[in-house]
Amino acid sequence: MAPKKKVVGLIKLQIKAGEANPAPPVGPALGQHGVNIMEFCKAYNAATESQRGNVIPVEISVYEDRSFTFALKTPPAAKLLLKAAGVPKGSGEPHKTKVAKVSWDQVREIAETKKEDLNANDIDAAAKIIAGTARSMGITVE
């Protein structure tokens, strides 16, 4: 069995699906760890092609031989809520000004999508987490 490679860096980025390019923020973040930037961009774009338009967080593990692996996460709850509510951005003062409404069904659907990345035991707990995110963005849950 090959010896286990040593991880020397962990990079977390949020990039639009299928749109990774060497420009900031991707280039500088990978460059300082000595990763082949174009190789990552091609691999990321190929892996996220089906989810174009969404922002997909990625966690990149960089090894001492400058190779890397990456794990894709689910889109941020805030982005999914904005899309469901049909508004461009959340409220500047969320507890005073409400910008939109979403139904519990939409919240549960987002919770289903996010379940693997949330620290929740069941869908109801995950839905409460998503509802809390909505509340802090000035989106009412009904």
Curated annotation (Swiss-Prot):
Molecular function via GO: large ribosomal subunit rRNA binding; structural constituent of ribosome
| One Pfam family linked to the record | Ribosomal_L11
Entry's CDD domains?
A: Ribosomal_L11 (cd00349)
UniProtKB keywords: Methylation, Ribonucleoprotein, Ribosomal protein, RNA-binding, rRNA-binding
Gene Ontology biological process: translation
What is a single cellular component term in the Gene Ontology annotation?
Answer: cytosolic large ribosomal subunit
PTM notes: One or more lysine residues are methylated.
Give the source's domain of life in one word: Bacteria
What does it do? Answer: Forms part of the ribosomal stalk which helps the ribosome interact with GTP-bound translation factors.
What the record says about family reads:
Belongs to the universal ribosomal protein uL11 family.
What is its quaternary makeup? Part of the ribosomal stalk of the 50S ribosomal subunit. Interacts with L10 and the large rRNA to form the base of the stalk. L10 forms an elongated spine to which L12 dimers bind in a sequential fashion forming a multimeric L10(L12)X complex.
Tell me the protein's name.
Answer: Large ribosomal subunit protein uL11
Q: Which organism is it from?
A: Mycobacteroides abscessus (strain ATCC 19977 / DSM 44196 / CCUG 20993 / CIP 104536 / JCM 13569 / NCTC 13031 / TMC 1543 / L948) (Mycobacterium abscessus)
Query: Which gene name belongs to this protein?
Result: rplK
